[in-house]
A protein has these predicted regions:
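Sequence termini and other peripheral, non-core segments
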Residues: 1, 5-117
Length: 117
C-alpha cells in the first residue's frame, strides 16, 4: 500500500496516465538501446497488452497530482519540480543518461546545489 499504488488505483485517470508513462518509458528504452536491432523491454513485452485497459473496479474520480514520495526538503507545490529536486539532491550518485545528453534542468540543478559528480 505504497502511496503511489494507492494513488494509481484511486482513479481511472491516474491509472491511464501511469500506463501512458509506462508506454513512453518503453519507447524511450527501445530508442536508446536498439542500436541497429530493435529491442523491446521485457516488462512491456509481457505486460503492455495486459495493463492497457483500466480495471473495471477503478472508477473515474478525477485527477490529483501524484504523491511526492520523498524527503520533505525536496517537495514543492509543483510535482515535476519536486521530483527533479529529488533526483538532484538524492539520486545524483546513480542517475545516468546513456546515449543522450543530460537534461538542462539536471545540469542547472547540480550547479545550483553545488553537487559535483
Amino acid at each position: 500500500n505504497h502511496p503511489s499504488t494507492i494513488w494509481t488505483r484511486s482513479s481511472s485517470q491516474h491509472y491511464d496516465w501511469l500506463f501512458r508513462l509506462f508506454r513512453m518509458l518503453s519507447a524511450e528504452y527501445s530508442m536508446r538501446y536498439s542500436n541497429g536491432v530493435f529491442k523491446v523491454h521485457k516488462s512491456w513485452e509481457k505486460l503492455g497488452k495486459l495493463l492497457e485497459t483500466v480495471p473495471k473496479n477503478i472508477e473515474d474520480n478525477g485527477w490529483e497530482d501524484p504523491p511526492q514520495c520523498m524527503p520533505d526538503y525536496c517537495k514543492d507545490n509543483d510535482v515535476v519540480t519536486a521530483y527533479r529536486n529529488y533526483y538532484i539532491k538524492e539520486k545524483s550518485y546513480f542517475a545516468k543518461w546513456k546515449f543522450i545528453n543530460q537534461p538542462d534542468w539536471y545540469n542547472e540543478g547540480l550547479k545550483n546545489a553545488n553537487i559535483r559528480l
